[in-house]
Design a protein with these regions (language model features):
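Terminal-region recognition feature
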Residues: 1-175
Length: 175
């Protein structure tokens, strides 16, 4: 689970600053690697120890990972919960320490104190975001829509060990 120290960045809880730093870092490394063939590029390592955070900013990190020509390895040390789970699963190569914990749940979405008509739009947006969230998981892992729907129906958090994450295709190896 090691890499070139100049290509390692840490992801904690996802907020504006942290997400923007990671997106910028990925783009800078891709710019520096532009003359190299894909096979000659040293990977970027994102160390994940995150309880989650801002979903929109997290989607920005996921898109930067997916768009990166330079390979991105995500490594979990500690926790990959909520949006941290999605980012962790989005890596091109994914590994975790043996005591890492992963967690999936329905997104947390609050309604603003506005008029009733505004609430309908907020609920529609929440559903749209939940669909994106789940589609990323279904694309990057072996989890099924049925498994995700059960968790949402039961309104619970689904915690998984590193061994579980390996079985479900959330990670590729335990290091």
């Amino acid at each position: 689970c090691s890499s070139d120290l100049n290509r390692i960045i840490t992801l904690g809880d996802i907020d504006e600053e942290n997400a923007n730093d990671i997106i910028q870092f990925i783009h800078e490394i891709n710019y520096l690697d532009a003359e190299k063939t894909e096979s000659k590029r040293e990977p970027i390592t994102i160390i994940v120890n995150s309880y989650g955070g801002d979903i929109y900013r997290g989607f920005g990190v996921v898109d930067a990972i997916k768009d990166s020509v330079t390979p991105i390895h995500t490594v979990c040390y500690g926790a990959a919960l909520s949006m941290g789970f999605i980012i962790m699963a989005s890596g091109h190569k994914r590994s975790a320490s043996k005591h890492s914990t992963f967690m999936y749940h329905e997104i947390l979405w609050s309604l603003n104190d506005e008029k009733l008509s505004s609430h309908k739009r907020e609920v529609e947006e929440g559903k749209r975001i939940m669909d994106i969230y789940d589609s990323i998981i279904l694309e990057c892992t072996n989890l099924t829509k049925k498994q995700l729907d059960i968790v949402k129906k039961e309104h619970r958090d689904w915690y998984m060990s590193a061994e579980d994450a390996l079985v479900y295709g959330i990670i590729d190896e335990i290091c």
